[in-house]
């Protein structure tokens, strides 16, 4: 299995929603081997959004809130590391966690995807 997909706990959920993926993740998207959507068209067990700004993160959270199939669905936001030489962002782990908490999500797991990207997994908070 692709090492990034393994880190993201991908277990064959289908279809998958991937939002705003940078070009260097083309190979990872191809490794999914399931239908991959880049715009929400239903319900998903696995959603991955790439955000370089707070506004992008909030937009992805709003899409995910409607698109996640159920409480077991996996939702990740990938964001540039502070040490990235390629990307600039106004996000980090703590600010992303606090921001999405306001939209009904709780950050539960953090992984490093590569030298430029980290990802934080969120679960919907039951209301």
What residue spans do the PLM features occupy?
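Short acidic low-complexity segments
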Residues: 34-44
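Catalytic cores of nucleic-acid ligases and guanylyltransferases
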Residues: 14, 19-22, 40-42, 50, ...
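Short, glycine-rich nucleotide/cofactor-binding loops
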Residues: 47-58
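N-terminal, charge-rich interaction modules
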Residues: 1-29
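Class I S-adenosyl-L-methionine
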Residues: 104-127
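Conserved Class I S-adenosyl-L-methionine
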Residues: 90-111
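Mid-chain, well-packed structural core segment of small domains
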Residues: 58-93
């Amino acid at each position: 299995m692709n090492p990034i997909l393994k880190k993201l706990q991908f277990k064959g959920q289908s279809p998958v929603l991937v939002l705003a993926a940078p070009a260097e993740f083309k190979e990872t998207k191809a490794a999914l081997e399931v239908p991959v959507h880049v715009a929400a068209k239903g319900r998903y067990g696995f959603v991955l959004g790439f955000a370089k700004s707070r506004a992008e993160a909030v937009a992805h959270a709003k899409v995910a809130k409607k698109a996640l199939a159920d409480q077991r669905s996996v939702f990740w936001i990938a964001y540039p590391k502070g040490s990235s030489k390629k990307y600039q962002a106004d996000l980090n782990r703590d600010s992303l966690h606090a921001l999405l908490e306001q939209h009904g999500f709780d950050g539960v797991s953090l992984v490093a995807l590569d030298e430029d990207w980290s990802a934080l997994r969120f679960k919907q908070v039951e209301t």
